[in-house]
Amino acid sequence: MNIIYQGISLSDKESIQSIKNITDKDTNYFMIKCASSLDGNIEKEKNFDEYISYAELHSIPYGVYYVTNSTDIKQTEKEADFVFELLKNKKMQFPVYIEQVNTDKTKIKEATDSIVAFCGKAWYNKFYSGFRCTASYLRNNLDFNRLRRYNFWLVCHSDRPGNPVIPFGMWEHTNKCRIDNTLNMFPESYCIQNYPKTIRQNNLNGY
């Protein structure tokens, strides 16, 4: 596995104070949680704007993700519109991901339809997109063959990624990354795709 970039994830679990000493020498990129939706109530992350401002001020590339438990296409499309409105006038060098948290294994088609709908909306709005989940969620809760065309951000906290049923472009390998001069531990991901190059060449994500 050829690791091109290493980056950390940020959400409201962290704070702007926890990253104030981080520079582009400490990490190659941020993955910033922008919103979450539980039962149709989508809310923006409180620290989202501050994280974006910090990344831009310190020239740290970034992508975003949002979390939802929706398996309804119309609801997911509404959430997508909310997310893409947040991303207006921003230049992101990494994709925008949907993380779906649905425990109902009888709704495989609906869950997959929702991810496809989100990624379709993303493409329409000129965003490079994908989905984020564990290998077991991919295998048991989704029709993974329909998702092969999209960027896959694997969550597997281990020293090896295992054998997920489709290739991944990014792998969150730990939630206990320690960065010098900071008190917090962060989720860290390895990126094996040159997303910044692909995004710029195709004029996506604000480019």
PLM feature spans:
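Functionally critical loop-and-helix segments that line ligand-binding/catalytic clefts
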Residues: 1-12, 143-207
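Substrate-binding cleft of extracellular glycoside hydrolase catalytic domains
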Residues: 1-128
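A generic local structural motif
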Residues: 17, 138-141
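Short beta-strand/turn micro-motifs composed of small residues
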Residues: 66, 133, 156
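Noncatalytic linker/hinge segments flanking ATPase motor cores
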Residues: 71-74, 106-107, 136-139, 173-174, ...
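Structural recognition of alpha->loop->beta junctions
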Residues: 78-98, 102, 141-168
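Aromatic-lined carbohydrate-recognition surfaces of secreted/lumenal glycan-active proteins
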Residues: 124-139
